Amino acid sequence: MNKLVFCLMGPTASGKTGLACELLTHFPFEIISVDSAMIYRDMNIGTAKPSIHELQRAPHYLIDIKDPVESYSAAQFCTDALSLCAEIIKRGNIPLLVGGTMMYFNALQKGLATLPEADEAVRKRLEEEALSQGWDFLYQKLSQLDPVTAARIHAHDTQRIQRALEVYYLTGSTLSTYLTGPHVQPDYYFVNLALFPEQRSWLHERIAQRFDAMLSEGFIEEVQQLQAKWPIQINLPSMRCVGYRQILEYLAGHYDYETMREKGIAATRQLAKRQLTWLRHWEGALFYDSQNVGFNIDIIAKIREILDNTVSN
């Protein structure tokens, strides 16, 4: 049991946070957040952070660790998460990693590839091409060169599009090849519990309801407060979080309210689609349909079975 790490993964709005809090009442877990949006301070409503009440019941590590103008990489996440896992196990508890940033899960479990350093000449060339042809053109180029990576990132995620093309131009190999190649893996046994709603319509409806709830709770005002406190720009990594970019465009007068709402919901559904694409190919994952009554009971039973078998062995 000393090296056992549980991972609760799933698409946005699938019920991960509520389940994680419930699991803490049954097992000696400590929660590590695996969410590239929740790392940011002052971004609470739009990232669907656990409530104050939930955090009091179930503290989460790696929430509110960066300002919205800062960046945070998969490599930094791996360093932080592995350090926390060691501390949690030393205390006699079990790490429970919870979130939907699949690239973080992938990097942690499979190890980070030794990717080439950034090359200013290649980046400048790509930026010039983006200015003349547009980022949509570069995304289409990436889709042809590396369809696996293109399917995992958003068409407007210019930073990751640039990095994926940069890796290809520097090495002749795709980023997806690096991510799936043999790497040094951490010395843990990961149990992957995947929430995978079979009916997309159910998930899509939950996403729409949650986005509307965020707007009612003050999502627009949250973005205005960010603008007042920080030098917020639309190309910041934090502003790639779904909803924030659309509200920035709305506040700039580029969208009306209804268009902003529709685009925010659509972007969230696209995020869920990419997360499900990752999960569908996740080897060894245990899948649970979170729209089924009693799915949580099944997960609790499985965890108990795994822990009992680990102790007996």
Curated annotation (Swiss-Prot):
The keyword Cell membrane does not apply. Its EC number is 2.5.1.75. Substrate binds at residues 12-17. The record marks 101, 123 as: Interaction with substrate tRNA. Residues 35-38, 159-163, 240-245 are annotated as: Interaction with substrate tRNA. Keywords: ATP-binding, Magnesium, Nucleotide-binding, Transferase, tRNA processing. Pfam families: IPPT. It catalyses: adenosine(37) in tRNA + dimethylallyl diphosphate = N(6)-dimethylallyladenosine(37) in tRNA + diphosphate. ATP binds at residues 10-17. Its cofactor is Mg(2+). Disulfide bonds: none annotated. The keyword Transferase applies. It comes from the Bacteria. One of its GO terms (molecular function) is ATP binding. GO terms for biological process: tRNA modification. PANTHER family: TRNA DIMETHYLALLYLTRANSFERASE. Belongs to the IPP transferase family. Catalyzes the transfer of a dimethylallyl group onto the adenine at position 37 in tRNAs that read codons beginning with uridine, leading to the formation of N6-(dimethylallyl)adenosine (i(6)A). Monomer. This is tRNA dimethylallyltransferase. It comes from Legionella pneumophila (strain Paris).
